[in-house]
C-alpha cells in the first residue's frame, strides 16, 4: 500500500467499500488495540499456532519471534494485540438499549393519540426488533464475561519497521469471534501509525 504523500483520510477513501465497513464494525463493537512487549510474545505464539492449525500452514516458533527483537532491535519490531473490551461494549449496548426503549415508549404514546399512522407503526416494529436484538446482545455479553473475563483476544500481529516501509510479517486471529473484525483494528492502527511516522510503504507481506 503506497502511503507516500497521502493523508489518512485519502487512504481510507481508497479502501474497498467492504474494508471501510469492516473498520466501522470493529469501532462499533469497541474493539481496542495495545502494543505487546517482548515478554508477552507467548500471546502471539499461541494465537499463531491456532491459526496455523486452522489454515494448515506451519507456524513460526516463539524463539523465532524473540530472535526478531534481538536481530532488528525493539525499535524496529512492533507486536499488536486487538481485543474486545467487554465492559466498554456492554456500556455502549446498554446505552443503545435504553435509548431504544425510550423511543418505543414515545412511539406508542404517539400511536395512542394517532392510531393508524403507517409511518409510526413501521418505526415501532423496527425499534421493537432492534430492542429484542439488543436484549440478546446484552445477555451474550454477560455470557462472554463469565467465560473470558473483561476482554477477548481477537487478533495478534507482528510488524517490522525498516527503511521506508512497515512490513506486516506475522498475523493470527480468533476465528470464533471473527464477527468483531479484530484484524482490521490492528491493520488500520498500523497504517495510520505508518503515516504518522513518515513511512512511504505499508507492506502486506504477512500471513493472516
Question: Would you name each region that the model predicts?
Answer:
Residues 173, 184-186, 208:
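Active/binding-pocket-proximal capping segment
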Residues 1-179:
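A conserved beta-strand-loop-helix scaffold within acyl/acetyltransferase catalytic domains
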Residues 194-206:
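Conserved GNAT acetyl-CoA-binding A-motif
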Amino acid at each position: 500500500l503506497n502511503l507516500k504523500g497521502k493523508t489518512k483520510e485519502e487512504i481510507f477513501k481508497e479502501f474497498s467499500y467492504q474494508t471501510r465497513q469492516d473498520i466501522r464494525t470493529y469501532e462499533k463493537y469497541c474493539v481496542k488495540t495495545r502494543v505487546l512487549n517482548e515478554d508477552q510474545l507467548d500471546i502471539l505464539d499461541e494465537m499463531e499456532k491456532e491459526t496455523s492449525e486452522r489454515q494448515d500452514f506451519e507456524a513460526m516458533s516463539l524463539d523465532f519471534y524473540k530472535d526478531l527483537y534481538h536481530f532488528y532491535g525493539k525499535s524496529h519490531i512492533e507486536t499488536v494485540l486487538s481485543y474486545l473490551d467487554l465492559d466498554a461494549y456492554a456500556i455502549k449496548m446498554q446505552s443503545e438499549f435504553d435509548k431504544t426503549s425510550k423511543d418505543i415508549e414515545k412511539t406508542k404514546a404517539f400511536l395512542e393519540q394517532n392510531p393508524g399512522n403507517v409511518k409510526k407503526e413501521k418505526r415501532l416494529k423496527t425499534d421493537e426488533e432492534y430492542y429484542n436484538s439488543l436484549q440478546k446482545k446484552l445477555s451474550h455479553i454477560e455470557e462472554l464475561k463469565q467465560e473470558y473475563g473483561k476482554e477477548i483476544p481477537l487478533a495478534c500481529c507482528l510488524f517490522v519497521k525498516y527503511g521506508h516501509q512497515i512490513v506486516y510479517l506475522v498475523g493470527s486471529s480468533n476465528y470464533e469471534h471473527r464477527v468483531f473484525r479484530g484484524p482490521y483494528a490492528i491493520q488500520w492502527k498500523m497504517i495510520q501509525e505508518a503515516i504518522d511516522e513518515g513511512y512511504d510503504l505499508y507492506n502486506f507481506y504477512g500471513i493472516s
